[in-house]
Amino acid sequence: MGKAKFERTKPHVNIGTIGHVDHGKTTLTAAISKVLADKYPSATNVQRDFASIDSAPEERQRGITINISHVEYETPKRHYAHVDAPGHADYIKNMITGAAQMDGAILVVAATDGPMAQTREHVLLAKQVGVPYLLVALNKSDMVDDEEILELVELEVRELLSSQDFDGDNAPVVQVSGLKALEGDEKWVEQIVKLMEAVDESIPEPVRDKDKPFLMPVEDVFTITGRGTVVTGRAERGTLAINSDVEIVGIRPTVKTTVTGIEMFHKQLDEAWAGENCGLLLRGTKREDVERGQVIVKPGSVTPHTKFEGTAYILSKEEGGRHNPFYGNYRPQFYFRTTDVTGVITLPEGAEMVMPGDTTDMKVELIQPIAMEEGLGFAIREGGRTVGAGTVTKIVK
């Protein structure tokens, strides 16, 4: 069979493996990669072995170092980018900093153990940071001979999903053996195919960035003599046509204006797309009316807020974080998109303090409003140095 041509026409979906550290996430990831490479050879489906996935390269996201592996593969229906964070701490950091946004995830539970404390923690976190869908791979199923035990473990996992408002009743639960599938055992290779069919069917197709309402964080502001004020930045989502109305949101009262010109690399464009760096010429806007940290958005799509609840990972001393704990009423800077705003932290009831290396929930009140929505990431900084990173879980005001 000749090499299949890489088709950009397939829907692209971001997924990941989550679950307890010894339940075989990385082995399963390697097995998916091998089985799909054998069954559907293509430019994308290149087998990745365990070692290459496990020795995850370090990435920096909002000032935090995370080990994370990216594996790419495709089924006949979809193209997938799959993230695997080998260590428990890496997984927690990845989820909270949004280093890899997931459209859905495979919860890996060893049939030999059932759900463990880390399994529960990962499911809770997936809910908090807004992973839309979970399905289950019961790994190491080859090591359990008793059907009843498998049924009990499945029941327990379904209850765990339901307890965090995932669809525990209907989520696919597939018995797999990553190790046996890697060894080429036909029965278990088939189960990996079955798992990927379940992923294709059950993880909803995400709304792509370009189909969402337009948003561009302002990075810089210039005056072009005779033409007016230009704001530059990278469009985060949506598309924007020339002569569209937009709002400038955050930090000061919201203002409406019209985009009379769009430029990219000194070329005039008719529209700006998600992912592009561009300059927008704003009608009748003075240079001092706009500043870095505001966002340019489709009118009515985003509102500014000062109070929110979030979940955050606080860097350990070894990671370059604080050397000592912080208490309630701590006032660091919160870095959203392109700017720092001071905020006051209130800790959850019963929590005296937060130690470096901890994960915590918090309530925050900012001194200036910021354009935000649930799921938005932020860094916590002190004098320009990152001491933590988190995600907005709920907007209060």
Swiss-Prot record:
Gene3D superfamilies: P-loop containing nucleotide triphosphate hydrolases, Translation factors. InterPro entries: EF-Tu_GTP-bd, EF-Tu_GTPase, EFTu-like_2, EFTU_2, G_TR_CS, P-loop_NTPase, Small_GTP-bd, T_Tr_GTP-bd_dom. It is found in: Cytoplasm. GO terms for molecular function: GTP binding; GTPase activity; translation elongation factor activity. GTP binds at residues 19-26, 84-88, 139-142. GTP hydrolase that promotes the GTP-dependent binding of aminoacyl-tRNA to the A-site of ribosomes during protein biosynthesis. This is Elongation factor Tu. It comes from Clavibacter sepedonicus (Clavibacter michiganensis subsp. sepedonicus). The lineage of its organism: Bacteria, Bacillati, Actinomycetota, Actinomycetes, Micrococcales.
